[in-house]
Amino acid sequence: MRKGLSLIMICSLLVLGGLWGSPVVHSAEDIAGFSVNFENLKVPAGVSPFVDGSVIMVPVRPVGEALGYEVTYIKEQNSLLMKSDELEYVYRLGGSTVVTSGKGQLALEGKAVLKDNRIYVPLSFFGALGLITSFDASSFEAAVITPQKYADYVVGLLNAGQYEELWQDLFNTELKRLVSISALQSGWESLDGTYGVYVQLNPVTTMQVKGQTVIQATAEFSKGNLSMIITVDNNARLTGLRFTPAAAPAVERELPEGLTEETVVVGEGTAHPLKGILTLPEHSSGRLPSVVLVHGSGSTDHDETAFAYKPFRDIAWGLAQQGIAVLRYDKRSYTYPKEFMGDEAAASFTVKEETVDDAILAAGLLKLDKRLDPGHVYLAGHSLGGMLAPRIDADGGDFAGLILLAGSPRKLWEIVYDQNMNVIDGLDDSNPLKVQTRSAIDGELMKAKALSSLSTEQAKQAPAVFGIPAFYLQEMQQHDTAELARRLAKPVLVMQGADDFQIFAGTDFPLWKEVLKNNPAAEFKQYPGLNHFFVNYDGAGAGTTAEYNVPDIVDPQVITDMGAWINAQYSH
């Protein structure tokens, strides 16, 4: 895969128009134009949407029906019922919540009104249902769009070659400065050589993250698939667009003979219980050493499934074959995505809730198991999990030893900056993206360097840095990985793939040696030819995320070395 693809479709932000300004107040006589799914809404005379103060009011029946809902007024309950094949919403007139499919409730800003025997609801009613809404105060034009139609429209403009229209109509001023029409065109057209002709966009999924709608779908091309992720603000403005290789199915494997697996619960009795899998040798005598596997970044399952890999499955089985019990579990943000990645949580969500607390609970679970030796519980953390391992240990994990798999003692934003610059440096000087994106990345770097000067409240309100919430990064750097690691006197094994382009063998591996130089129990192993997931790959697309899409397993030598190291500590 060309590195140009990785850059424009992963690093570039493609944005629509300006943001909301201060609310504009109008009388109730002002009428707003209205569209549904990019089509003008046709309504009977006298039934148009209107602006009441700073609230846009829309006739619920024609809008709901245009969106494909059956809309019914239940007189006995003074309620509105909106039904589709899959969803049902009930709104009691005069209330401030919408009941979804008889279960959850959605908060609603404003209340319905009756005008000329028609029920009007605030535009925010449809936003609460997960639809995309907008209002242009200068033209008095409002809109409601389903996430599927929005995504289809964006990719449709790209596929039709209407780059200038997309740029003129949908980009905001800042993104027009960063991404030219020619850069947009070259980014989309660069897909053709590797993935072929665009075919269709599959059904989308959505979630709310820090006030924005994140839409994900698989885009099918004639030679392969790509995952498309777009991010939309609260005025239907596109704030992000990226394409990444869609994952092929991971290598299917059966549990090896001589092993057994049990389903357990990490954090049982807490507000966030997590499904876990404990892998054990089927026949053993005496108490066993054990390992907690701690995930990298992102919302991942107990196998740490990423693209076409299942690294935690491979490690768990390989270690259990060496007489070591292994606990792996679903990440909290994987099990409770809306709770931990939604609007309200995003500003205060940190690695403590995402990773640290659950790893400590997992260690406690192993220490209580009578089949296992409580004095020989180890942590093996991959990527972000490796970075956080010293903190998890210090905050209560109290492990017998730590295995750091492709971790780093540096700040997270430093690594993200290097990852982006690595892609930029690989571009031809003639590529217009090179200068434009370098400028954008340098701007993000300036924001990152300013994090330490912000108060907690300022960080919670600050814009994202490299697409990561500012407070998340600030809180993480307040628990300095290098400083915590310097205090370690227990056994530590640092493992690094030489071909890792996410954590750099030439930078991070030597830094670990420097940080741990006073720890005589620290050991270091580097593996030629292995990538970030400790998979050996040298085919097409090597050095880009394309290689992660080729199904494979963790190199057996890595797992053998892990097991030998743990058993050596145990024998002592």
Whereabouts are the PLM-identified features?
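Short beta-strand/loop motif that positions the catalytic acidic residue
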Residues: 488, 494-496
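Short solvent-exposed beta->alpha transition segments
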Residues: 164-212
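Short beta-strand element of the alpha/beta-hydrolase
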Residues: 286-296
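Cap/lid segment of the alpha/beta-hydrolase catalytic domain
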Residues: 294-353, 424, 536-547
